[in-house]
From Swiss-Prot:
Keywords: Ribonucleoprotein, Ribosomal protein, RNA-binding, rRNA-binding. PANTHER family: MITOCHONDRIAL 28S RIBOSOMAL PROTEIN S6, SMALL RIBOSOMAL SUBUNIT PROTEIN BS6M. Residues 105-117 have a biased composition (Basic and acidic residues). Pfam families: Ribosomal_S6. InterPro entries: Ribosomal_bS6, Ribosomal_bS6_sf, Ribosomal_S6_plastid/chlpt, Transl_elong_EF1B/ribsomal_bS6. This is Small ribosomal subunit protein bS6. The keyword Ribosomal protein applies.
């Protein structure tokens, strides 16, 4: 099955638990359609470069999936219809890199720098 990476931004007024439950919800949509979530990361509440739907911040989430194209299309369709999801981006990749994503690596590096001071 093809490999995909998805990033979506949800509204800023959601709690962290609600934003993380969206990841689980869309993972179950994939599972119902014959796919699976290989890895998921919640990147947290981040400030955006510009407003989207009158929101200056958003909860970012990242999914690595292994799913057939119809399952991904159904998940994207439901994401775009969901009121809490503001933006969705999906890319097809040849392979999933091992370890955490670049965003999570940056956070770990920042924590290491603070410890050295």
């Amino acid at each position: 099955m093809p490999l995909y990476e998805h990033v979506f931004i949800s509204r800023q007024d959601l709690s962290n638990a609600q934003a993380e439950s969206l990841v689980e919800h869309f993972g179950s949509v994939l599972a119902d359609n014959g796919g699976k979530v290989v890895d998921s990361e919640y990147w947290g509440l981040k400030t955006m470069a510009y407003k989207i739907n009158k929101n200056r911040k958003g909860h970012y989430a990242f999914l690595k999936t292994d799913a057939p194209a119809p399952a991904v299309q159904e998940m994207e369709r439901l994401m775009r219809l969901h009121d809490d999801v503001m933006r969705v981006m999906t890319i097809k990749v040849d392979e999933h890199p091992e370890g955490p994503s670049i965003q999570m690596q940056k956070r770990e590096e920042r924590d290491n720098r603070r410890e050295r001071r």
